């Protein structure tokens, strides 16, 4: 399969060269190229059918290949190859499993001590079974609302670091906030603190070499996650590390929606105010966040750091703060962990489901769960951005609005600035904060990490944040929304058609 893909890429290159030298060859060899492309397309269509993907994905791929053979062929090479994905991440999955079996303690005892309703307990058992990380009762959490509050807390904790600082980010910029982070990390490295920084090679592709080299010269280990040497000839532009993790001395951790960049402080002229949510964690649950980082670090460097100095019991926090569970999702896992936990949260609801997601492109399972909940009389609300970030995703999201509105889902468009929070609150008792959007990319392609909260004070804070956000949002009226121009509907429909491919 891998060799076939490389041969197919060679066919494309030859075709381009033949096109550029058309006058010289007289077009004689273009017929051969057309036959090769046609055979490749037929072969790919056959492979897609045998992979037993979801019907929506299969139909979308076959439609694109049939309508635009050449473009569809290229698109498949970049985004569609499941076989190479599975083979590529098999080794990571095996090493992750070995670490978990050695270092994770059983979770059912903690689950039984949580004061949860009987209908909610299956969610915890599911999370432990497919997520493989325990629920912690000896942890404290604090919701950090927006950039100023988040970065203030991060820098305050970084200054206190004595042994190690571990960072993992999708986007890192060398702007004002990025420079501030660089100077703090260089200072801590000079003090003898071990600083390890894993950044995504695609998300941070604009990060300057000078920035990286300055940190390395100061003793900071800067490692790119899954570098892409030939982005147009490799589907490595998918399967990105979308996680945002900081672990300090094994006892303090951060996770959430904010990357490292000035736009997250509202300094971008287009976006303006940036609405986001992050989470500060202290205590036992940080150990899980540490494990997730160390697994990713080992995958990229081959360096095992599974020693007591990194995995010893963290700061003692008394029980009684509710439960905290860190769950990692990614293409290296057998189950669609984040999606299945979202689904379980939605179907466990008795009173309310409030969702904030900047990129809302659900699959049929999540879409049906939301509609059924609303039709059952549950208060289902979706908070989405009114200002587009990625236009194709924005229009694809809006294509789902009519059927959701018709089912009784209340949809609000955030108007104060750009909404980037990735939060779910169910019945005011269960919540999720993290890096995963409610879209197919987060469900199937990206490496993500979410914190699931059970009966914590932080959940109450999230409810209050939602109420404040609704004040700065406008509800969408179903009748008025149906009157949008026909050309807009076409764009939405095409974007939605492409969404299973992206």
Curated annotation (Swiss-Prot):
Q: Report keywords, A-Z.
A: Cell membrane, Lipid biosynthesis, Lipid metabolism, Membrane, Phospholipid biosynthesis, Phospholipid metabolism, Repeat, Transferase, Transmembrane, Transmembrane helix
Which residues does the UniProt record annotate as the domain PLD phosphodiesterase? Answer: 237-264, 415-442
What stretch or stretches form a coiled coil here? none
Which residues constitute the catalytic centre?
Answer: 242, 244, 249, 420, 422, 427
Provide the E.C. number(s) assigned to this enzyme. Answer: 2.7.8.-
The answer to whether UniProt assigns keyword Transmembrane helix to this entry is yes
Q: Which reaction does it catalyse?
A: 2 a 1,2-diacyl-sn-glycero-3-phospho-(1'-sn-glycerol) = a cardiolipin + glycerol
Q: Topology versus the membrane, per the UniProt entry?
A: Multi-pass membrane protein
Location in the cell reads:
Cell membrane
* GO-annotated cellular components: plasma membrane
Top-level EC class: transferase
The record's annotation in InterPro entries points to:
Cardiolipin_synth_Firmi, Cardiolipin_synthase, CLS_N, PLD-like_dom, PLipase_D/transphosphatidylase
Keyword NAD assigned: no
Q: Where are the transmembrane segments?
A: 7-27, 29-49, 59-79
Molecular function (Gene Ontology), one example: cardiolipin synthase activity
What are its GO biological-process terms? cardiolipin biosynthetic process
Q: Which HAMAP family match?
A: Cardiolipin_synth_Cls
Q: Indicate the family of this protein.
A: Belongs to the phospholipase D family. Cardiolipin synthase subfamily.
Q: What's its job?
A: Catalyzes the reversible phosphatidyl group transfer from one phosphatidylglycerol molecule to another to form cardiolipin (CL) (diphosphatidylglycerol) and glycerol.
Please state what the protein is called. Answer: Cardiolipin synthase
Native source species: Geobacillus thermodenitrificans (strain NG80-2)
Task: Name the gene for this chain.
Answer: cls
């Amino acid at each position: 399969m891998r060799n076939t893909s490389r041969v197919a890429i060679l066919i494309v290159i030859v075709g381009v060269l033949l096109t550029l030298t058309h006058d010289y060859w007289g077009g004689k060899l273009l017929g051969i190229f057309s036959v090769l492309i046609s055979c490749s397309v037929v072969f790919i269509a056959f492979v897609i059918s045998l992979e037993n993907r979801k019907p929506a994905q299969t139909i979308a791929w076959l439609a694109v290949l049939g309508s635009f053979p050449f473009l569809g062929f290229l698109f498949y090479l970049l985004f569609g190859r499941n076989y190479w994905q599975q083979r590529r991440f098999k080794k990571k999955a095996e090493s992750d499993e070995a670490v978990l079996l050695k270092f994770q303690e059983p979770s059912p005892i903690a689950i039984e001590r949580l004061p949860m309703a009987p209908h909610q307990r299956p969610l915890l058992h599911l999370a432990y079974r497919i997520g493989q990380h325990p629920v912690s009762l000896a942890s404290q959490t604090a919701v950090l609302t927006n950039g100023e509050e988040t970065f203030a807390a991060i820098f305050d904790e970084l200054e206190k670091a004595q042994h190690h600082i571990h960072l993992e980010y999708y986007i890192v910029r060398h702007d004002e906030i990025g420079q501030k982070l660089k100077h703090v990390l260089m200072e801590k490295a000079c003090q003898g603190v071990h600083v390890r920084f894993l950044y995504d090679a695609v998300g941070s592709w604009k990060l300057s070499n000078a920035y990286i080299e300055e940190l390395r010269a100061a003793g900071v280990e800067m490692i790119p996650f899954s570098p892409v040497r030939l982005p147009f000839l490799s589907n490595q532009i998918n399967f990105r590390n979308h996680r945002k993790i900081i672990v300090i001395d094994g006892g303090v951790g951060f996770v959430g929606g904010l990357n490292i960049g000035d736009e997250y402080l509202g300094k971008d002229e287009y976006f303006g105010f940036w609405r986001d949510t992050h989470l500060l964690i202290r205590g036992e649950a940080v150990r899980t966040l540490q494990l997730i980082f160390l697994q990713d670090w080992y995958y990229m460097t081959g360096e095992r750091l599974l020693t007591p100095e990194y995995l010893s019991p963290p700061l003692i926090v008394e029980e009684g703060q509710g439960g905290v569970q860190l769950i990692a999702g990614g293409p290296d896992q057998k189950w669609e962990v984040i999606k299945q936990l979202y689904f379980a949260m939605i179907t466990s609801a008795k009173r309310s489901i409030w969702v904030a997601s900047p990129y809302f492109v659900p699959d049929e399972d999540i879409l049906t769960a939301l509609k059924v909940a609303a039709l059952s009389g549950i208060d289902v609300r979706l908070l989405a951005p009114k200002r587009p970030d990625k236009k194709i995703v924005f229009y694809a999201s809006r294509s789902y609005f009519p059927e959701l509105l018709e089912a009784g889902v209340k949809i609000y468009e955030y108007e104060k600035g750009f909404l980037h929070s990735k939060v779910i609150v169910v019945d005011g008792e269960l919540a999720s904060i993290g890096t995963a959007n409610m879209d197919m990319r987060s469900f199937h392609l990206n490496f993500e990490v979410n914190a699931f909260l059970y009966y914590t004070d932080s959940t109450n804070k999230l409810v209050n944040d939602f109420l404040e956000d609704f004040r700065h949002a406008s509800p969408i009226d179903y009748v008025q929304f149906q009157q949008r121009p026909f050309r807009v509907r076409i764009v939405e429909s095409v974007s939605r058609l492409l969404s299973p491919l992206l």
